């Protein structure tokens, strides 16, 4: 990597963030595309967020990525939001366009790009969970022309989830069905007629539990995806593969959301195949 007086900076901003693999991905991409850039991780306190955003302009940076807890907190300090960032109510990428700071959310696009030979337009989807990742997938699916979405959450989370779905319907005219995860017969009935089943909860990170009962029967054409990438194969994905279903983990989402951000910053395509190889060697 060449560092000189013309090197432009990009960073991921969060707390905690030292464990992030984003610097690995983006610095590989800068090198592979002969882009004079460097990508670092900044672990900051909330009180430093305003100054950090100001530094994007001050140092003529490409921009920044954001992770928890700053995806929502950054919004008041930006000049403009993309459609999907407005719908999600969260930003994971800030682009410096000649001093104008524009907020995007590339998580949903990254998720759908990582699915092999699959387009969501006209399809039926089941989403488990309603946190930040789920919201980005939900909003992107609506923008991309999904025909039906069923969101399943634990019954204790129903009331907390409903206002966001109501607001989404106001903004898009699209009605999302909200169901309780405990109603297994309802889950089975909806899975039977769906094209895509997504785990957007953290259940499975421990390598022990699955978010759905193992007696659920999957239709053979159903694509199953998990946003978790460590462990590389969660119990949820193992269960889906044992029924013969295609199953995808969250590492591709991480790579392709980064590729979207890289293109917004540099105008260049990230060499995803090359970087995917390095990532799978590192995490498989």
UniProtKB/Swiss-Prot annotation:
Q: What is its EC number?
A: 1.1.1.25
Q: Which InterPro entries match?
A: Aminoacid_DH-like_N_sf, NAD(P)-bd_dom_sf, SDH_C, Shikimate_DH, Shikimate_DH-bd_N, Shikimate_DH_fam
Q: Which Pfam families match?
A: SDH_C, Shikimate_dh_N
Quote the Gene3D superfamilies the UniProt record gives. Answer: Leucine Dehydrogenase, chain A, domain 1, NAD(P)-binding Rossmann-like Domain
Tell me which domain of life the UniProt entry assigns to the organism this sequence originates from.
Bacteria
Catalytic activity line of the entry: shikimate + NADP(+) = 3-dehydroshikimate + NADPH + H(+)
Which controlled-vocabulary keywords does the entry list?
Answer: Amino-acid biosynthesis, Aromatic amino acid biosynthesis, NADP, Oxidoreductase
Q: Which residues of the sequence carry a binding annotation for shikimate?
A: 20-22, 67, 92, 107, 229
Annotated positions binding NADP(+)? 83, 129-133, 227, 250
According to UniProt, this protein's pathway is: Metabolic intermediate biosynthesis; chorismate biosynthesis; chorismate from D-erythrose 4-phosphate and phosphoenolpyruvate: step 4/7
Q: Does the keyword rRNA-binding apply?
A: no
Q: Where is the active site?
A: 71
> What biological process terms from GO does the record include?
amino acid biosynthetic process; aromatic amino acid family biosynthetic process; chorismate biosynthetic process; shikimate metabolic process
GO molecular function: any one? Answer: NADP binding
| Subunit comment | Homodimer.
Q: What does this protein do?
A: Involved in the biosynthesis of the chorismate, which leads to the biosynthesis of aromatic amino acids. Catalyzes the reversible NADPH linked reduction of 3-dehydroshikimate (DHSA) to yield shikimate (SA).
HAMAP family, per database record? Shikimate_DH_AroE
* Family according to the record: Belongs to the shikimate dehydrogenase family.
Name it: Shikimate dehydrogenase (NADP(+))
């Amino acid at each position: 990597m060449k560092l000189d007086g013309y090197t432009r900076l990009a960073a991921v901003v969060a707390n905690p963030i030292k464990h992030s693999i984003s610097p690995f991905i983006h610095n590989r991409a800068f090198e592979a595309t002969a882009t004079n850039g460097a990508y670092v991780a900044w672990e900051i306190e909330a009180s430093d967020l305003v100054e950090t955003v100001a530094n994007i302009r001050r140092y003529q940076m490409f921009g920044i990525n954001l992770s928890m807890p700053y995806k929502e907190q950054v919004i008041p300090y930006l000049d403009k939001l993309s459609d999907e960032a407005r719908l999600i109510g969260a930003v994971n990428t800030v682009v410096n366009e000649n001093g104008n700071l524009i907020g995007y959310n590339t998580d949903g696009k990254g998720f759908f790009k990582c699915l092999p030979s699959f387009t969501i337009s006209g399809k039926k989807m089941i989403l488990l969970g309603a946190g930040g990742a789920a919201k980005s997938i939900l909003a992107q699916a609506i923008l991309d022309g999904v025909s039906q979405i069923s969101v399943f959450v634990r019954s204790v989370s129903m009331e907390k989830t409903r206002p966001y779905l109501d607001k989404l319907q106001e903004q898009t005219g699209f009605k999302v069905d909200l169901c309780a995860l405990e109603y297994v017969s309802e889950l089975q009935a909806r899975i039977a007629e769906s094209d895509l089943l997504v785990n957007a909860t953290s259940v499975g990170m421990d390598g022990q539990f699955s978010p759905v009962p193992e007696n659920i029967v999957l239709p053979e054409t159903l694509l199953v995806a998990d946003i978790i990438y460590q462990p590389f194969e969660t119990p949820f994905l193992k269960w889906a593969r044992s029924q013969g279903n295609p199953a995808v983990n969250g590492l591709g989402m991480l790579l392709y959301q980064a590729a979207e951000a890289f293109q917004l910053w540099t105008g260049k395509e990230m060499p995803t195949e090359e970087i995917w190889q390095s990532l799978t060697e590192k995490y498989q």
